[in-house]
Amino acid sequence: MGEMLSRLEPLYLFNEDDRANDLVSKVNFDPSKNIAALLSQEELGLIEEVWNAPQGPAASGWKSGLLGWLLDTTNGQLSYGQTEYANYFASAKDKNFFSPKVRNTFTAGVGCAVLSADGYFLVQQRTEGLLAGRRLDSSAAGMGVVREGKLDFYFEIKEKLKRELNLSEEEVKNTLVPTGIHGAADYLSSQATWKCEVALSLEELMAKANPKFIGRVHPVGKDDLPDFLIRHYVLPGNEPEKSLIGDAVGVFLRALDVDAREYAIGKMNSDGADICFGVFREGKFEEHL
């Protein structure tokens, strides 16, 4: 990671008053809008250098596929242009080397809060070597990949649940519901968020975790989730394994009921977080006061 900033970076909860199901089902993808138009030659060179570094993504066999780039959350739909994973990886890893325009972009992703049959949310600790290595994350998460010219967040979250927790569509389809969309400035990502309940005990669910992506699993009781978020939404310092990334906080906040969410946000903001509500209009955040 690049130099960590001295305070928590903003977490924007978009379109709080809109029905999440309507938003996530109305996705407009325009491939003619490309984030490359914002990048200078120097930034393009840095992206190539980071991607092709010894022991970097290319050397590890990663592919720089097409991803969604958030443009707008207004007019009853989500609008995206396109970027590539190499662009996202370099800018999220070392934001300080990029222009303010690039630092204010959000690349599409998905994240899910999974609740076990015996009442525990699963919080995962990412493995070493991933972009958010050793940090605490939601139950399952990943990028919003453009497939056959389309962004399909329902497909993406099912793919991530299968990839990271070996949960089949049959196991999640009856309870998997969208909860909203956010923008997390720490890793320049905008996740469409989901929650689901599974007919598996915590022990059974933990046994399914894929060690390629998940280093460790933390069970958090349903009623304990607000205080867990408050305690662990802190700067990573020398203990990244105790620090939630912004995306995870966005996912779990949207899994809470309104009163619990308001309590958690109020306490986190008083402790130094910057969580706010609004919309993303033509590439800029507009706060709802």
What are these regions (language model features)?
Residues 162:
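Juxtacatalytic substrate-recognition/specificity segment
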Residues 1-138, 143-159, 167-289:
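N-terminal leader/linker segments that precede catalytic domains of diphosphate-processing enzymes
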